[in-house]
Swiss-Prot record:
This is Probable G-protein coupled receptor Mth-like 12. One of its GO terms (biological process) is response to starvation. Belongs to the G-protein coupled receptor 2 family. Mth subfamily. Residues 18-215, 269-283, 337-373, 438-454 are extracellular. It comes from Drosophila melanogaster. The lineage of its organism: Eukaryota, Metazoa, Ecdysozoa, Arthropoda, Hexapoda. GO terms for cellular component: membrane; plasma membrane. Residues 237-247, 305-315, 395-416, 476-488 are cytoplasmic. Coiled coil: none annotated. The gene is mthl12.
Length: 488
């Protein structure tokens, strides 16, 4: 028994030692460089006239990409924490410029020149000097400031600073004079566009929050995509489901499928070369899905309230023209905005910035209400009005024909069939509306740092990811649909 316990403890110690050797204390992976082929002199490695002590080195059997994911390497490589011996500063890289190997292809140089104060963040926190005292401290002129690349994050805030509004410290931290706030070099990054007035004016990206994809979300999204595919396959293969209402629903489901498919492909980093194009497509299909459901709600209202049961020959063509053209208009608008003002940080608050924070449209600040949230609110409000009007009409008709139910069972059966169709689409509408509402509440909670890591917030995230599964269960896994499939 004692021998087994001894072996177990030895195994734990060896495992801890192995894991600890793969990391350098108080040094992030992106602050290290590969020094496997550099000379070792005494107890240090020489890199471009800089000495990296052996205690700032470690062996890594993986490569960490810009998005934080880790890729195993064929052989372990020795890395040294260069930012402990040389000033480093981060410059953000747009998602569309990140290559498959984790490098950034926006052409920004590896070094920049900045005047820095001969103090560290720790010195400022300990002494708490005034601005006048800071001006008397010698400056640290660095011509070899190493550039670290980091991708944009949701909730990032672009801030423009004049020369007298900031001070760069020699450890890469920045002191903001107006707010007396100190940001460490991993709490901000520089905007990738360096202008002629640099460094008299710099533009920094203030990290307001970090969003990490929760465990299982990607897998749920893959299953949702499969759910959309199966639902579409059933509707396309069963002739009774391909009436005008069914065709509109097929188009709506296809739009939602494309939206989820693009998000899933983006998560697995399969859109490297077409990130911006995929972002515009995702926005286009997102608008299309809500427009198609507005068409469905309008058609249901017209179907129930109109005395003329004859469907116009070109009605579906009219619906198609309306939806796709209407969705294309805001897509062209945000594309034009990005093309004209993308390189102007002063207008960044109003830009959708497709391809910067992901292969999608920026949708968390106030300006996103104009090209994302307000159109969806209008469409959802229209859907509510249509469904309420239809419900009122059905209630009145059922009340009116109740006394004639025994005399004309055929009309009652027809009415019951239409009511069941209506109820089915009401359920679908409620799921879509609830999904959008939960998504907005999730973003609001994250941005306000409310309900973070709570069951309520986590549940809404998982429900949104599983939307394709809910659609499949609602529309396919029921007796009437199975009966149509068997009769096909």
């Amino acid at each position: 028994m004692f021998l087994w316990l001894k072996c177990f403890c030895t195994l734990i110690i060896v495992t801890i030692a192995k894991n600890s050797s793969a990391k350098i204390p108080h040094c992030k992976y992106d602050e290290t460089i590969n020094i496997s082929h550099f000379k070792r002199l005494n107890d240090a490695y020489i890199y471009e006239h800089f000495e990296i002590p052996a205690n700032l080195t470690g062996e890594f059997d993986y490569k960490e990409l810009m998005d934080g994911s880790k890729v195993p390497t064929e052989f372990p490589n020795l890395r040294g924490c260069i930012c402990k011996v040389r000033p480093c500063i981060r410059i953000c890289c747009a998602r569309k410029n990140i290559l498959s190997n984790g490098e950034c292809s926006d052409g920004v140089k590896n070094e920049i020149k900045l005047t820095m104060l001969d103090l560290t963040m720790q010195d400022i926190l300990l002494t708490d000097p005034t601005l006048a005292e800071l001006n008397m401290i010698p400056q640290y002129n660095s011509t070899e400031l190493l550039i670290l690349r980091e991708q944009f994050q949701p909730c990032d805030e672009i801030v423009s600073l004049k020369r007298d509004e900031y001070t760069i410290l020699k450890d890469g931290s920045i002191l903001l004079h107006t707010s007396a706030e100190i940001l460490s070099n991993d709490q901000y990054c520089l905007y990738p566009e360096i202008y002629s007035d640099f460094p008299e004016t710099i533009r920094i990206i203030n990290r307001r929050c970090y969003r990490n994809v929760m465990p299982g979300i990607a897998q749920l999204s893959v299953i949702s995509v499969v759910g959309f595919i199966l639902t579409l396959a059933v509707y396309l293969s069963v002739e009774k489901l391909r009436n005008l209402l069914g065709k509109c629903l097929i188009c709506s489901l296809f739009s939602m499928f494309m939206e989820y498919f693009i998000w899933t492909m983006d998560y697995f980093r399969l859109l490297q070369s077409i990130c911006s194009a995929a972002g515009y497509m995702k926005y286009f299909f997102s608008m299309s899905s809500y427009l198609w459901f507005s068409v469905v709600s309008f058609h249901l209202w017209e179907l129930f309230t109109s005395l003329n049961r004859h469907e116009p020959q070109y009605r579906f063509l009219i619906y198609n023209t309306f939806v796709w053209c209407t969705a294309a208009i805001p897509t062209v608008v945000i594309f034009s905005m990005n093309q004209m003002w993308e390189n102007d940080p002063g207008k960044s608050e109003w830009l959708p910035l497709v391809g910067y924070f992901g292969c999608s449209v920026k949708d968390w600040n106030s300006s996103s209400w104009f090209y994302s949230h307000i159109p969806i609110v209008i469409l959802n409000s229209f859907n509510v009005i249509m469904f309420v009007l239809t419900a009122i009409y059905i209630w009145k008709v059922k009340k009116g024909v109740k006394s004639f139910a025994q005399h004309d069972e055929r009309n009652t059966t027809c009415l019951e069939f239409n009511v069941q169709t209506y109820i089915q689409f009401v359920r679908l509408f409620l799921i879509m509306g609830a999904s959008w509402l939960l998504d907005q509440l999730t973003r609001l909670a994250e941005d306000s740092h409310l309900l973070l890591d709570t069951i309520v917030l986590n549940l809404t995230v998982y429900l949104n990811a599983a939307f394709g599964i809910l659609i499949f269960v609602l529309l396919i896994l029921k007796g009437s649909t199975f009966k149509m499939i068997m009769e096909r």
